[in-house]
Amino acid sequence: MQDQDKYTNASAPQAIPPRATAPGRMNRAYLTVDLEEWYHLDYLKGFRCRESGVRVLPQIFDFLDMLDEEGVKVTFFCVGEIADENAGILREIVRRGHALGCHGLDHELLTNKSLEQFVDETRRAKAMIERAAGREITGYRASCFTMERDKLDATRQLGFAYDSSKIRFAQHPLYRNLDLSGFEQAEDLVYVKDDFTEYEIPTLDIMGYSIPISGGGYLRLFPFWLLRILLGIYARRHENFTIYVHPFELTDVPLPLPKGLGKATAFRCLVGRRGNLKKLRKVIRWLKKRGARFITLEADRRERGLR
């Protein structure tokens, strides 16, 4: 590994350029999927949920069909350890024209891994996914957005061209505000350094509090009428938007949650799953009506002249 200083600069990202669209109108929308099993949830660490035999990834085809109906291409980030057993799904994702990236080897938090361990495991995960999918992958997303700067620099050394792990959400104990010193902000949510791109997960700042309106449990929790209001506020301030979802949120297949999990944690895992796919379709259509063009992160890079 080369010294990380090669990619580090004391300057902060530059101020965002003027928006290309009128307030209330959207430019680009990036729909992303963390391709993992339900037992990868950080809430379930320490339990032996994997042994239940219940899997949600085989239900992903309803989601893929919905994307086809809406004419939307998305970016998937796959956990390496499940790639081989889901090779058919990965190849179908690629066949339908979606982008595929890496979501780590085992979904453990990067803050719990040394740089050396991260490099070794990421190299292995990349090879697993590429073998299963039959194509090269160039994108990365850290589990629970726990990317750190030295590991971000390492992804470039490992052959990745873009990452999507940055989120501004200080109120969440897991998330980190990723250091992007030396990057320039190309436009809303998009940061570039040389030929490497970082895509941010948006939050909405209201009265000093960051509201994560872009996906995950918050997409499940918020009713659509509230999401519509929050997205309307967001659209007046920003022109690009990133959504992130997980396969277990796109199906209502019963999950055998372990005893002793706790009511609050069980609520976080289960709230809003039923009907969430329909709600996501509504969000997609809302963004389209405001001019948003859905595009994969790979295609976005190509349009910027990056490879």
Positions of PLM-derived features:
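Active-site beta->alpha N-cap acidic-glycine motif
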Residues: Y7, I16-P17, T21-R96
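Conserved, mostly hydrophobic/aromatic
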Residues: D34, L67, H103, Y140, ...
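Short catalytic/ligand-binding loop motif for oxyanion handling, primarily in non-cytosolic enzymes
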Residues: Y39-L41, D84-N86, E108-T111, M147-K151, ...
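The substrate-binding groove and active-site-proximal loops of carbohydrate-active enzymes
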Residues: F47-V54, C78-V79, D106-F118, T138, ...
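C-terminal domain-boundary segment and adjacent tail
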Residues: D68-E70, F222-R307
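Metal-dependent polysaccharide deacetylase catalytic core of the NodB/CE4 family, i.e.
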Residues: E70-K151, F160-A161, S165-K166, D194-D205
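Active-site-adjacent pocket scaffolds in enzyme catalytic domains
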Residues: R131, R135-Y244
